[in-house]
Amino acid sequence: GLSEDYVKPTIGPDGAITYGFFAMSEDGSDLPDSLGGYELDWTLCEPVGRGNFVFAEKEYRGIPTLQSRYMSADTPEEEAQLERFASCGGEYADVPLLIFDVRSNPGGSDWWFMEWFNGWTGQYAQPHKCTGHRYSQIGCDFLDYPDEAMGTWQVSSRPGRWVEREGLTFLLTDAATASAGEDVLLDLHTVENTLVVGVNTGGCSLVPDNFTCYLPNTGLPIFFGTGLGFYETMENRDTVGYAPDLWVNPPDALDAVARMCEYYGLRG
């Protein structure tokens, strides 16, 4: 048989679930030219790019589609988009089909999605996780922790909570989905009838609570985290990311999901 390292479930041209050749590689030079009698011509999967918005709502071929490209705002217009994001979850609570698109979302604050999820399901997401946070001088300054806590650790663990839901949810990801963008994936992994479509995420979830600080003598900015976080299988997924359920070149993922819904009669 063919190795699972290269053969993955995907969505075919007609919308049927089938198999295709996908692999993780830095530049493709380490990939085989043939497998099991198949001659292979590898193509690089590309991210879709952020675009000129942080959150948008639309319908794609009759399917409600939410696009989250960044969870931070630089302008009043973007702030309004994020406020809409946080407040609209309840409007999608009963839709039978939903596409949630976090392709090329590099992160920001996960608060916006947490509030959306609460409106959507009636509860906050609780993925299986274990986190540790060291109370450093910088952390105490930034987060107003008491000085007497400095040098100690706060460690917490929770088993996770499953959310039952009858409607189908499709999450779109690409290699530029990272940090808070990956939190969306981890949270939606707790929801019944959710499928992730695309490719591996960027792998940027080990170190939470990142801040920009400035060196005292040069004024140079540095950006780093103040804790450690492990999720689901408790493996470090940095640089590897989280794999999709169905592998599709990210620019084609939206159309592929619509084809699949049509092929299997999921629109009702």
Regions found by a protein language model. Name each.
Residues 81-85, 155-156, 180-181:
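Amphipathic coiled-coil/heptad-repeat helices and related helical stalk/stem segments
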Residues 196-254:
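BRCT (BRCA1 C-terminal) domain core and associated BRCT-interaction motifs
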Residues 158-162, 239-268:
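Extracytoplasmic/peripheral linker and loop segments enriched in polar/acidic and small residues
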Residues 70-74, 104-110, 175-179, 201-205, ...:
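Solvent-exposed loop/turn segments at secondary-structure junctions
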Residues 168-190, 195-203:
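Extended C-terminal subregions enriched in glycine
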Residues 73-79, 146-149, 173-174:
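Short, flexible loop segments at the rims of nucleotide/cofactor-binding pockets, characterized by
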Residues 106-168, 207-214, 226-230, 236-238:
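Gly/Ser/Thr-rich loop/hinge elements
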Residues 1-98, 102-128, 168, 211-216, ...:
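Flexible, low-complexity junctional segments that flank or bridge functional domains
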